Curated annotation (Swiss-Prot):
HAMAP family given in the database record: PanC
Listed Pfam families: Pantoate_ligase (PF02569)
Subcellular location: Cytoplasm
Source species: Rhodopseudomonas palustris (strain HaA2)
Residue sites binding ATP per the record: 34-41, 152-155, 181, 189-192
Main localisation: cytoplasm
Top-level taxon of origin: Bacteria
UniProt catalytic activity: (R)-pantoate + beta-alanine + ATP = (R)-pantothenate + AMP + diphosphate + H(+)
Primary gene name: panC
Keyword terms of this UniProt record: ATP-binding, Cytoplasm, Ligase, Nucleotide-binding, Pantothenate biosynthesis
Protein name from the UniProt record: Pantothenate synthetase
InterPro entries tied to this protein: Pantoate_ligase, Pantoate_ligase_C, Rossmann-like_a/b/a_fold
Record EC number: 6.3.2.1
Residues that bind beta-alanine: 65
Amino acid sequence: MPRPPVVARTLPALRRALDDLRRRNATVALVPTMGALHDGHLSLVRLAKRRAAKVVVSVFVNPTQFAPHEDFGSYPRTWKADVAKLAAENVDLIWNPDVKTMYPEGFATRIGVDGPAIAGLEDRFRPHFFGGVATVVGKLFLQVRPDVAIFGSKDFQQLRVVTRMAADLDLGVKVIGAPTIRERDGLAMSSRNVYLTPEQRQVAPTLYRAMKETAKLLKAGRSAEAALAAGAKMITDAGFALDYLEARHAESLAPVGSIKDGPIRLLVAAKLGNTRLIDNVAV
């Protein structure tokens, strides 16, 4: 039987648990999550175990990164299953605060983000999002004080924003991006995939196929404008409502015009019915 992780729900309990973990100067890795864990999350946990002696997983559905019309209330919450999965991975500590612990009455301080990493893409459609992400991740870093933190590359713009924030604010955390984990048909694993109907689930992998085709055209020398137009047509022809398909510099996230401006990352967001999916691939 796997050893159940310690669960902390208050800051004093978290500090006591962290003091125990850090005996003999053990290194600590943090994997921030919103729960509803799948194999993609567990791949982050496994990478964390390779990068540090002790692993902390936070499970907190952060209300400040949801707009009023988004799915905060219906976001999947699978606590018992999450704990069982983390126990099977021998996670040392689960940090599971409630909203009042993270945002007590009178809370008035937020982290703002700026620069090319936030320009366009998700910020255009969810202007509240990265302020909420930066604030909650900044708090998690200060609460846990990990040596390393593991984030999935599926949320690539988020990864770049968090990496920049940790460096700019001298938080002393090494942010590591882990590869996107995909289903056999190429669909990126996501907690929101449960919203897809069976018919939509059959269509959803088109998003990944369209990005691969766009990358192929870029590598063949087509301009970003032409390659992106071809990829966008594949996506909309499949029934998606496309928010964006863009080619950006993989480090700065500045827009690019051709393969010569690389390294390039393709980033996409589109809605299939009521479900919004995001993904990205390297070129």
